[in-house]
Amino acid sequence: MNYMIIYEIIAGILIVVAILIHFNIMKNKVAAIKSQTIYESNRLKEEAKKEAQSQKKEAILEAKEEVHKLRNDLERESRDRRMEIQRLEKRVLQREELLDKKNDVLEKRESSLDKKQQEIDKVQAKVEELYQKQREELERLSGLSSEEAKDILLEEVNKEIKHESAMMIKEVETKAKEEADKRAREIITSAIQRCAADHVAETTVHVVTLPNDEMKGRIIGREGRNIRTLETLTGVDLIIDDTPEAVILSGFDPIRREVARIALEKLIIDGRIHPARIEEMVEKAEKELENDIKEEGEQATFETGVHGLHIELIKLLGRLKYRTSYGQNVLKHSVEVAYLAGLMASEIGIDPTIAKRAGLLHDIGKAVDHEVEGPHAVIGAEIAKKYRESPVVVNAIGAHHGDLEFQSLEDVLVQAADAISAARPGARRETLEAYIKRLEKLEKIANTCEGVEKSYAIQAGRELRIMVKPEDIDDAGALEMARNIVKKIEEELEYPGQIKVNVIRETRAIEYAK
């Protein structure tokens, strides 16, 4: 037990001794590290000091070199400036010497000029004195003052100038007229040669061929019902005579004539000919004709190269195919006028597009002149304005018969083209136009009466057939209307023979069995 304690004490002493030895070793190491650190620090300080001194010396040397360089540059610049100043001073001195010399020369010249001016003044005074003496002598000899002589001379000169001016103006005007007439003939001749139209006058009848003569009886119908219905609905005379396999449609209005032709041809093909079927076919023919009218208008614009027209203007153009002026087809005439106006516009150097447009539309008023009062040129101008045509086109339409004043070259071209087309041999017939005008006036008298639904002048104007509205006109009123219309015709129209006025009042009651 005691040994154990002793061993433990010895072990504790050894541990303490070991700790002390270790502490002493560590202390020595720390002291060594510290001394090493101090040494290194001192060494670095010495090296830094040496480096700083070295850099300081280098900086001082560089500064000295820079100062030396700057001093040399300043000295060189100063030397150059001194030399430049010396050169400038020398030039200034030279200029001063030159100016002094010039000044001396100018003074001498001025002195010389003064002397010459004095001499000139003396000579001028002598000339003035001589002139005055001569004028007084002339006045004494002529008995006129200088002002009077001057006025006489100016008057003579003025007369001579006026005479020469008048002669020159007359010569220029004569030459200009000759050139203008020659150029106008060339333009018109060129336009006519380049526009060779083959259309001639229209007539007022149309022949419909029949498959056989038996068809004539079917067209007439029992007691003439079919032919009366067709004539009443279309306003066209059906002439059935001994001509084999043919029926003649006679009427002054080409639209009615065309409706009757289409309806009759459809009835012949269909074979069923009775009043109800006739009404149906006439209605179909009217619709078909409306489409044809639109197509004709579009074809006319395509042929002439006029684009962008309002659809209503195109329809009115198509209606012109079924209008005649002195027997001349108005649509063909309008296309011809458009070509001529465009060609002449190209010849004189203006835009042919506007001239062609105005030429094509110039007779558009004839498409509605049966329904609207006034000259067709003014009506056409109002229609074109309504559908937003340009002011140039509108005025050209209105001015082509002198109803409006000319405002542009296009107005004159359209009038000239219209006259050329109308004057072409075979284009128009005066007697046919007078006949159509009489029939139109006959229908117009009937249409002015209240309650008239539609009216037709048939039998070459020997009969006026009037359809009235049954709800507005009774039987007694129909008789009174017939008498009034007869009276108006006798007062307003001149006509051969007599005219039959036929007022028709028809009432229909329709019901459907279901």
UniProtKB/Swiss-Prot annotation:
PROSITE patterns in the record: HD, KH_TYPE_1
Record's keyword annotation contains Transferase: no
Sequence ranges assigned to domain KH in this UniProt record: 204-289
SUPFAM superfamilies per UniProt: Eukaryotic type KH-domain (KH-domain type I), HD-domain/PDEase-like
Gene Ontology, cellular component aspect: plasma membrane
Domain HD: 330-423
Localization in the cell: Cell membrane
Gene3D superfamilies hit by this protein: Hypothetical protein af1432, K Homology domain, type 1
Matching InterPro entries: HD/PDEase_dom, HD_domain, HDIG_dom, KH_dom, KH_dom_type_1, KH_dom_type_1_sf, Ribonuclease_Y, RNase_Y_N
Coiled-coil ranges (or none): none
Topological category with respect to the lipid bilayer: Single-pass membrane protein
GO molecular function: RNA binding; RNA endonuclease activity
Cited CDD domains: HDc, KH-I_RNaseY
Stated role: Endoribonuclease that initiates mRNA decay.
Protein name (record): Ribonuclease Y
Organism per entry: Clostridium kluyveri (strain ATCC 8527 / DSM 555 / NBRC 12016 / NCIMB 10680 / K1)
